[in-house]
Amino acid sequence: MTNKIQQFTSTGSKLLFHPDFIDSVRQTNLLLPISIQLAPTSICNLSCSFCSNRNRQMNESLLFDAVKFVLDTYNDLGAKTVEITGGGEPTLYHAINETITYANAKGYQVGLITNGTGFGRLSKETIQMLKWVRISMNVLDYRDGIDIPKLPKALTLGFSYVMNADTRMDEIKITLDRYIKEHKPAYVRIVSDCRTDWKTQQKNNQMLGALIKEWGSPYFYQPKEFHKPNECWWCYVKPFILHDSFVYPCSSIVLNSGSEERFHEKFRWMKIDEIPMAYSGMKQAPFNSRNCDHCVFSAQNALVGSLMHPNGMEMFI
């Protein structure tokens, strides 16, 4: 993989690096998890204007026993990585150090998505256990600055920024460049505010894609394409576990037109304690995606769907 989109974002092409998964699906017609996303708390210390989960309950946090159950269960099913994310701001979770330590002890590679304000809540030992950290630099829209500690050389640091109504276009690159010079992130991902319609999103992708290309490395623009999937299988491969004790099919359901800018109940897949049943060996069914009109995982769903529905011509590549 040579380009930053392929390396540092969720793409269907990464499935090619999991031949054991592909072989298992071909032999059993059952999907098993590769990675999980865990949002342990809804608590946050920012109120970003573009937050796609802004209408959430603001005081929800998973019990640490529930987190351990999730990590144990998906580990037994073969999951290899966990992304700790929001929700809210994950470093505000009361058991964030214990969660990372437990996941590491189970053999997970652990990534952390944070607004960068809570590094002081992470122990030095915990930080050493992280594979990567991605900081949402939109914190600079609301704070004068953040303190990023010296991180282990083996840890991949990345920045992300959402272009939004509060963005000061004449200032943001200057500010980001200052942090890039000091902390040398592997990448700076730029995305648009996805709380919009398809036509506006296409315009944003075109305009911002051209702009960020001019900015050069380490910047890259990640276009988000909205689709309505025929079938949703991605839920089995990379499920999203939320602070309300439910599992959702993915992180993008908050973008759907009926989501009310939160993880709406209509998009719940199952309760946490029902996870084992979803992989129990019974015939799996896709998540009902009739209300998913802003899916950004269409490529992933298409690839997994082709494994679930072989047509007999797979050898003719």
Residue ranges and their predicted role:
Residues 40, 44-45, 89, 159, ...:
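Generic structural signal for small/hydrophobic residues in well-ordered secondary structure
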Residues 2-125, 129-132, 142-145, 302-308, ...:
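Conserved alpha-helical substructure of the radical SAM core
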Residues 31-33, 154, 290-292:
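Sequence-level motif detector for i,i+2 pairs with an aromatic at +2
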Residues 44, 48-51, 232-235, 250, ...:
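Short cysteine clusters
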Residues 1, 7-10, 39, 60-65, ...:
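Radical SAM enzyme [4Fe-4S]-AdoMet core and its adjacent flexible, acidic
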